[in-house]
């Protein structure tokens, strides 16, 4: 009986041991199965479409390796990086965006501020240029001590002359006046004296004193500087001989060559500031200005002429001067100039749409000043443009065909040449 109990106990213990072994084995099997299932269900390895050089993204390669253009490794382009090709935008991993240090800015509406300094030069005012002549034949009795470059005031004596024609006409006047000549005859003689060049003050003296004058003084008709004076005492003088040339000094002209691209900004005298190196602390008042009608064919500039007050004669003809232009454009859309990609053939920017995609857009830049560009078309107020990190995004847009979709929005994906190009065989020709 005791041996029977021992036999039953041994069977029970053996059964328990066998059950435990089966349980452990089953648990290990199930655990290992659970671990292998995810491994088997892992996503397949990304498919590489081609390799490219980020510095020249329009060329594709069929193998990895060194770029033939730059000393750098080619970068793979994966199939799942192309994004939604039905739209013009591309997606970039947020981590990469952060690493690139991308900065964006809203498109605003405002006016471009211009502040440009242009070299200029001082010249005589040609409206204040006179030629002094006797207008009758005679000879020089006296030359006053003057020469080229001397300043003269209006009424300053230049020369004393004797002119027989004037003496003869005076005699005729006195004869008609004393013998009952008609008013018309007397008036005609006086008018002949004026046309012959006799100074008006000498004519009035003749009428008041009734005395013939034989010596006359030619005087300066304006304030200015003598620019021609070549007479000597005792010289004969003909009626077409120049006694003197005198240039006025107040006001003077200041001329500057202004780029024709900013001619539309010239509005009124308040936008001009004049300075000269000789008197850096002086300011000068611009009375009026005008743009000359022709454009310099070589420099493509317009000639701007300003009439500047010069009462103290600080401004000397021939001086260097500087014309500072301070003005504003009309209101337009504005973006930072660094946001513009200008290839010479097209101008574009990278915008960010509501979904966070980067979308290239063609634009037309009207004007640029002080790192701001005025936009004529392609953007709307409130759009977001990328202002830094442009290069890599633009390269990505080129690779994914976004630029082609921008240029040819009517084409389908299959007809886009940028996406249908075959990768270059890195080993061809070897």
UniProtKB/Swiss-Prot annotation:
Origin superkingdom: Bacteria
Transport as UniProt keyword: yes
Gene Ontology annotations for the cellular component aspect, listed alphabetically: membrane; outer membrane-bounded periplasmic space
SUPFAM superfamilies: HlyD-like secretion proteins (SSF111369)
Location of region: Disordered: 407-430
InterPro entries: CusB_D23, HMBD, MFP_Cation_Efflux, RND_pump_MFP
Pfam families for the chain: HlyD_D23 (PF16576), HMBD (PF19335)
Keywords, sorted A to Z: Antiport, Ion transport, Plasmid, Signal, Transport
One BP term from GO: response to toxic substance
Family matches, as Gene3D superfamilies: 2.40.30.170, 2.40.420.20, 2.40.50.100, 6.10.140.730
Signal peptide (from-to): 1-28
One GO MF term attached to the UniProt entry: transition metal ion binding
Bias kind Polar residues: ranges: 414-430
Keyword S-adenosyl-L-methionine: no
Sequence similarity: Belongs to the membrane fusion protein (MFP) (TC 8.A.1) family.
Protein task: Component of the sil cation efflux system that confers resistance to silver. May be part of a three-component cation/proton antiporter.
Name by which UniProt lists this protein: Putative membrane fusion protein SilB
Organism of origin: Salmonella typhimurium
Designated gene of the protein: silB
């Amino acid at each position: 009986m005791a041996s029977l109990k021992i036999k039953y106990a041994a069977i029970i213990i053996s059964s328990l041991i066998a059950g435990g072994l089966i349980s452990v084995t089953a648990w290990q099997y199930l655990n290992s199965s659970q671990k292998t299932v995810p491994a088997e269900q892992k996503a397949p390895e990304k498919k590489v479409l081609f390799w490219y050089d980020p510095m020249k993204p329009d060329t594709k390669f069929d193998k990895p390796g060194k770029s033939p253009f730059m000393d750098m490794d080619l970068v793979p382009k994966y199939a799942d990086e192309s994004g939604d090709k039905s739209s013009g935008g591309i997606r970039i991993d947020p981590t990469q965006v952060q690493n690139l240090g991308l900065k964006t800015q809203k498109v605003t509406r405002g006016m471009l501020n211009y502040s440009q300094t242009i070299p200029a030069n001082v010249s005589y005012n040609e409206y204040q240029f006179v030629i002094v002549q006797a207008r009758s034949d005679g000879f020089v009795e006296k030359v006053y001590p003057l020469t080229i470059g001397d300043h003269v005031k209006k009424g300053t004596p230049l020369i004393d002359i004797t002119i027989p024609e004037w003496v003869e006409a005076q005699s005729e006047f006195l004869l008609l006046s004393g013998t009952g000549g008609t008013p018309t005859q007397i008036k005609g003689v006086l008018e002949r004296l004026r046309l012959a060049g006799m100074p008006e003050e000498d004519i009035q003296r003749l009428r008041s004193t009734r005395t013939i004058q034989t010596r006359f003084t030619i005087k300066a008709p304006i304030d200015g500087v003598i620019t021609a004076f070549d007479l000597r005492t005792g010289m004969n003088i003909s009626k077409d001989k120049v006694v003197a040339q005198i240039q006025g000094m107040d006001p003077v002209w200041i001329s500057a060559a202004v780029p024709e691209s900013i001619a539309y900004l010239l509005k009124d005298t308040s936008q001009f500031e004049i300075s000269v190196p000789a008197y850096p602390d002086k300011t000068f008042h611009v009375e009026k200005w005008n743009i000359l009608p022709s454009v310099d064919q070589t420099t493509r500039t317009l000639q701007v002429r300003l009439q500047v007050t010069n009462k103290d004669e600080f401004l000397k003809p021939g001086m260097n001067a500087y014309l500072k232009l301070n003005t504003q454009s009309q209101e337009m859309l504005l973006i930072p100039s660094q946001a513009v990609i200008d290839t010479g053939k097209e101008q574009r920017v990278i915008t960010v749409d509501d979904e966070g995609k980067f979308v290239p857009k063609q634009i037309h830049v009207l004007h640029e000043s002080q790192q701001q560009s005025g936009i004529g078309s392609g953007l709307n107020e409130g759009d977001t443009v990328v202002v830094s990190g442009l290069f890599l995004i633009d390269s990505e847009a080129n690779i994914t065909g976004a630029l082609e979709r921008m240029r040819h929005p009517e084409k389908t994906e299959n007809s886009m040449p940028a996406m249908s190009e075959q990768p270059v065989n890195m080993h061809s020709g070897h």
